[in-house]
């Protein structure tokens, strides 16, 4: 019975062009990467626009060397959870450095390191979203925030995308003793940024707290790459900030930055933190090298290059999208969605690009709402202007000739 049910579900996914398949990367994460299907005899060299390595640090020699040094110092694994014997000097130093970064934005800030961003989000929402609390969740939040809200014992209310007025009304009507606003900062499939200054004003008006997942902003936004709070110049003890260390930081893991009382509560009550083996100390050691690059002059240069590439890509894609009846999302970040609507069209465009040696993922429901299938184009600071021109050129060839004539 189980196998029959699963086969029917697989057939339904296939009929709706929703089947997902893994690919194998044969070389390091970089704009130019050798990739192949699981059963391919040899990988294909591809220009990739689908990783989240926004700062190009996953293959940075300093970070790679630090990872090796960390393994020599601390071994391959931690051996236990943080509360048993797995909390190493490398973990402690990483948390101290991140606390320094967030001291200007969260009074009495401390940080807590997690193995993954998913675990960090689950930990925060389940530890704070207890019975009697209410979570006010953005409709386009990441799946990990959605799942965390489902597992929390709190009441859950949803507000429309970036709609501060609707959130204001929900908060005003709530009698909950603990109100928690839950939002992405940079939305992972759209690239736009939550109105955090407005949300903070609402939090202060209604005595609420803000859980903000800055997975796609940390390392990229702000003069020093410290993320969305630095970029917007915000400071409040009401922020419970979650940053990812496997995207712009180029390694792995995540962290929570919050008032020290909140962090101490998580250490003692957050089950995803307590009941799992700590990440290898070598990873934390490598992240120290990554943070130094992000905050230093090289990081500033990389962010400047990334911002120029974003502008170049949007300038090239805007007329193509208009001609083809597609939508170029309103994004000023490294996540650039080209929304085509139909699932099959998104897959066909992705296949067309791959035939020309370019890899861009086709994103379909349930990851995005029905009717908004898209190419999710992501840029890295280590892409070049020529890389972007090549992508735009291939997409231009994919626009139907009749659409080009109508646009002309």
From Swiss-Prot:
SUPFAM superfamilies: PLP-dependent transferases. Its cofactor is pyridoxal 5'-phosphate. One of its GO terms (molecular function) is 8-amino-7-oxononanoate synthase activity. Pathway: Cofactor biosynthesis; biotin biosynthesis. Keywords: Biotin biosynthesis, Pyridoxal phosphate, Transferase. It holds the Pfam family Aminotran_1_2. The modification N6-(pyridoxal phosphate)lysine is found at residue 247. Substrate binds at residues 20, 142, 367. NCBIfam families: bioF (TIGR00858). Catalyzes the decarboxylative condensation of pimeloyl-[acyl-carrier protein] and L-alanine to produce 8-amino-7-oxononanoate (AON), [acyl-carrier protein], and carbon dioxide. Belongs to the class-II pyridoxal-phosphate-dependent aminotransferase family. BioF subfamily. This is 8-amino-7-oxononanoate synthase.
